[in-house]
């Protein structure tokens, strides 16, 4: 009986893991008034339509995957800014109606135009005065976490979801230049509190 219950719970957990996790990446350049041209590679994309002022939608993008499974996959989208400057790239999981149905995603690395961004493999870290570990050049909100061995082949990774996102700033992006932003991701379990 215990074995049957254990197998049933494992099956439910695996289904929940795959059913709820969809990686999402947002860029918002409203403050900079930097119009973005966005092209889908293997992610769906749109503007940030939840922003009420439709006139600023052209300064935003949101790209997301379909449901992720337990295998690592590489996903990407391409953005071209109309002005030179910094571009903030947010990494999260897709929104769901309730917090407990918002899945979690592991991000193994981030590349731009085929090159690993500075510390895009999350190897270098720093610790806040509160003791939270962050990958150098990245910011982790709330319960987003650095996982030293959570990546592909035991490398470092970050764990994110919709309310607990990771952030990276592409510095000095050039106007009119296309930037293909690539992530290696997979579905993950929620962190232990």
Regions found by a protein language model. Give the residues of each.
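Hydrophobic h-region of N-terminal signal peptides that target proteins for export
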Residues: 10-17
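Extracellular and organelle-lumenal recognition/adhesion modules and their flexible linkers in secreted
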Residues: 20-193
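Sec-dependent signal peptide recognition
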Residues: 2-8
């Amino acid at each position: 009986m215990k074995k049957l219950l254990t197998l049933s719970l494992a099956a439910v957990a695996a289904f929940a893991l795959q059913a709820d996790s969809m990686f999402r990446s947002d860029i918002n350049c409203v403050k900079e008034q930097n119009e973005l041209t966005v092209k889908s590679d293997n992610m769906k994309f749109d503007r940030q339509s939840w922003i009420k002022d439709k006139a600023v939608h052209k300064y935003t993008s949101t790209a997301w995957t379909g449901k992720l499974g337990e295998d690592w996959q590489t996903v990407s989208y391409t953005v071209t800014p109309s002005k030179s400057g910094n571009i903030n790239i947010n990494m999260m999981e897709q929104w769901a109606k309730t917090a407990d149905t918002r899945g979690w995603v592991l991000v193994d690395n981030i590349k731009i135009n085929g090159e690993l961004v500075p510390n895009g493999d999350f190897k270098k870290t720093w610790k806040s005065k509160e003791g939270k570990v962050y990958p150098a050049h990245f910011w982790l909100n709330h319960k987003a976490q650095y996982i030293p061995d959570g990546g592909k082949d035991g490398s470092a990774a970050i764990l994110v979801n919709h309310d607990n996102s990771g952030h990276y700033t592409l510095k000095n992006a050039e106007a009119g230049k296309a930037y293909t932003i690539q992530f290696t991701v997979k579905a993950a379990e929620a962190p232990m509190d």
